[in-house]
Amino acid sequence: MKDDKGRSDTVNGYYISNSKLSSGFYKRNNANTASNDEKPNLEQNDIPSVTSSGSSTPSSISIEKEIKISKGNVIVKAIRSWSLYVAIIAILLLLVILHSFQGRPQDNGCGKSYVWPSYVRFVDFDERYTRFANKYSLYLYREKSVEESDEPSGIPILFIPGNAGSYKQVRAFAAQAAHVYANAYAEDADGTLNAGKLVPDFFVVDFNEDFSAFHGQTLLDQAEYVNDAIPYILSLYRQNRKISSEYDNEAFPPPTSVILLGHSMGGIVAQATFTMKNYVDGSVNTLITLATPHAMAPLPFDRHLVEFYESIKNFWSQSFLLSPEENSLDDVLLVSIAGGGLDTHVVPEYSSISTFVPPSNGLMVFTSGIPSVWAEIDHQAMAWCENFRRVLIRGIFAIMDARTSKCTVSLNLRKELLSRAYIQGSSFQNDITQISKPIAQYKALDLDLTYVYSEMPGQLLFLNQLGVSYIRHHIFPIPKPTSSIDRFELLTDQPIDLSSSNIKVLACRLDPKIDNTISALLENGNNKVINANCHLLRELVTLLPASTAYTSSPYGGDSFYNYVLPKEKMDDYHFILVSDDSKAPASGFVVGGFSNVSLDPKTIKGSQIELFKSGRKFQFDTKGSISKRFRFPGIQSSIMAYTISVTYELYPGAVPQKEFTPMLKQSIESPFETKYHVNMSNTELSVHGISPFMEFFGKESEKSLTLEFFLNPAIYKSVYVSIQPSYYRSAGRLLMRYRTLLASFPVVVISLAAYNQFRYFHYGSAYLSMSAALEVMIRKGLIKLLFLVSILSIAFSYLISRVELIVADGADPVASWKIFAMMVPKSFWKQNHLLFGLQTAQFWFLAPLLTLMFVGLVITASVIILCVMHLLAFIYGIYLRYKGLTFTGVCQAVKFSFQCLRTRNTRKLDHGEFKKLSSFLSQRNMYYANPSLCYVYGKKHMQARIIGIMLLLLMAMTVVPFQLVYGVALCTQTVTTAKALHLARFCTKSSHYRKKLWDFYNFSCTITILMLLLAPLDFPVLIVWARNLSMHWSIPFPTHHNFFSIIPFILLTEILRTGKMLPRLNDVEYYINNVFLFLLSFYSLIYGAEKPYLIHNVVGLYFFWLLFLYAKNGFFVQNISKWPIIPRMKYFIKHKFLRSIS
């Protein structure tokens, strides 16, 4: 058929020419034919019997022979279908997970911080220093309430914001640092300067809120910019230090390194600076990261982001395996601070650094265990939490030392001071740099006011009120030898680490000129005074949250002080002195004494099955110690939550204290996590230990839960503990750890559904709809799939090489780490990134449970997509009506077209009857009466499409990322599918032709759903690109101009746009097609969590196969041969080129 412009048309399997319209219009293409009578569904009368176009002739499959199909209307079919109930189960599971996730403890123990900010931009930091000068900026923060000069002259600290983070997030930390220095300088200016403390100069980079979590190249650009900024920052001090009049310039050399403070992905940028080519050796020696996902990328959808992570971890781990002379990181300290369970952006376990940093150069803590914080903090609050910033800046201020060019103390001292600040704690009045130095005091104790306790453990000091008893001095003689005791321990609510405290706990030596034992002094009745040299050992004091009858959470209240003197340090002393110097009655308590109970935790054994079934129950006596520790080898997974109930048996006549109620401390060693539960009776337990998809590194005992109970042994006689699994609370913990599978696992389900579509289509049936294919998959393959994932989960959990070595107690931790680090890379199974990442076989049941949920969610999503397609088809029908259709014209077109079909004669189209319909309006009526004619495209239109494709591909290879072209292809395919649905629903031609339209729609819908599932993997890069475009940043994405990543999608969508149905396959093609579908399903199932970005390539490979099938049946030859340029090229080659050569 030629239109008024001379275009020759193709109608979905029928070829129209100007000369042989009749024969061409009804030329049969067996590859596209199905002799059905009705719209394809699962009814008996819809099962056709059509032979395949291949060499073999398989018999038609009867669906009812394999699956019992219900009769009735749509509602009855839906009620009786298995898909509905699987979808309902999946939705219920998802709702339980979401409700559990939202119902987790939400208490945020953060106070708001108040600042007076001022930012100084360095406009001189331009293209002379960095190629990113037009994109990023560098600022210096100044707190106007205490700082007047805008010139940096102190100690440089560079803050790096995270994903979509603002440079203004530095204000809370910088303001606190400015106040800390101002207060210290005002209190003792000379002492502050002599200690090497100068004003902290907080610099900050402005990344214009880049989406660094989505794109590896963006992280590389940011790391390069940071390395460009560091030398510029250091250059500012060479002149400013010389002209400063606040201190002796000779005592403070110009700095050669900066301290990096990174929030979220800013911590990864800080860590990556060492791997860049423009890094200056020694320019950074301390990194502190806040809520940074060091172990894994939070969204591994970008190939270069995952490779970026791997390169960083490999660089760090391999560097520490070198000798100190060759290791560029030998003097670098990395401190990682995680926010805990309130962080909904980053999985807390991802902040672990133990796999690539040895204990000598790394420190990892959770905010729930940081003294004076004792709270989980959400991701954004890490940048402004008042309680947290006080402790954080206190640690940074402690390690600063401007007397050296590195501006920090030595590596060992840095870790010791930060451990003191972030793990052990101390009163804020103390200078933590001086805590390790004992405070000497000489004591002359009046024996009339002194009580001497027995040398044997068991006798307890218990003061329920201070300043009341006439006994003011309590002496605990240290037995010689000390083998009969393990330690001296004391707990109080008084700040015993201050020399001004009313309660003093001192380790004392007797005056050797008088006597050297307490017993000798007491036997001598003439002595009225005990003279002793005593020391306040502040490093033995650890801060604990206050646990009273009035506290409900560990944060926001006062502190307890726990004093523990191990027997190894008792040899230099004769007795422990506890003095009550209160001059008037005061509230407070003291409980303490010798303990012969080891601090080593007692192991509570039991099988994992028993733990899941009935939990753990045990009891213990409190006699002999304030604290008791227990370890639970089976409780180590981060996806399981528990509830703990504690009941107490009191001594007869004892009354519970209000000032000190029982407290529970839960902890694991790797990663180091501590959490406190005050006023303990019932609470929830969960750990951030072994996590899905995380490397198993170190000893298993380091990841087991340890519980430590603090209580008054003078009141409580026995404790009864019951730990029960909480499956409801555990459900909420699955969301954060398996959210990436929401993007990859649906591909598994759709691939298996496509297999069923091709299977029935190959054996003569209609091409099943997605709903029917999913129903078949559920009835015939769901049990097999659940069984498969269960077996694979168990097998993978046992195949993982955990590199667990028997390391002697007390062995050098650095040497042990190197052994682990050297053995882990040698194992292929070193990481459990496969399938669901389950590292213990006991959790195998999660695999089929999650699989069932994902299958049901795919069913739900497919129903939603089909509804959207029907809506788009309806809109398309309205569009056709508004293109000038009339009821009379439609009726004439219907009548005319049926005459042609009935007589099998189209000569009328060449004569007067067609002339009557040749107007634009009449042609539209004809299209609406025969919707298949809407697939007709002329030569010029096809040429325009080809030119458009070539332009898109050229742009994808040069200017825009291929993900943008993919979005265009997805939109085109969506419109094609909606159009196909409209044509199939309103086609007025024969039932056989209408069947072809339904087959084409179902096939196109499958392709559309598959492409839609890839969108979450590709669109994050588009967000980054659009962000750069909005900032007028024109540097292209060199890593996202991949021709082969987009060409199969473009070509296939263009083929489908012409309405060409995939031909039936012969047996060989059918089995090859199955291999491709199973490959796609297998890869998405096994590697979907580790490398989901490669799913795009696997789908592209499958689309190449579909293109081959189209090409094999002559689609490209038939269409390309019609281009006018083809005969011209033949004429040119034959008559011009060949003649010129001859």
UniProtKB/Swiss-Prot annotation:
EC number of this enzyme: 3.1.-.-
Region (Disordered): 24-59
GO cellular component labels: endoplasmic reticulum; endoplasmic reticulum membrane; Golgi apparatus
Comp. bias regions, Low complexity: 47-59
Subcellular localization: Endoplasmic reticulum membrane
Membrane disposition: Multi-pass membrane protein
Any matching Pfam family: PGAP1_TMD
Molecular function per GO: phosphatidylinositol deacylase activity
GO biological process: GPI anchor biosynthetic process; protein transport
Keyword Hydrolase: yes
Main location group: endoplasmic reticulum
Class of the enzyme per the UniProt entry, highest EC level: hydrolase
InterPro entries documented for this protein: AB_hydrolase_fold, PGAP1-ab_dom-like, PGAP1/BST1, PGAP1_TMD
PANTHER family, A to Z: GPI INOSITOL-DEACYLASE, NEGATIVE REGULATOR OF VESICLE FORMATION-RELATED
Function: Involved in inositol deacylation of GPI-anchored proteins which plays important roles in the quality control and ER-associated degradation of GPI-anchored proteins.
Family: Belongs to the GPI inositol-deacylase family.
Protein name according to UniProt: GPI inositol-deacylase
Species the sequence originates in: Schizosaccharomyces pombe (strain 972 / ATCC 24843)
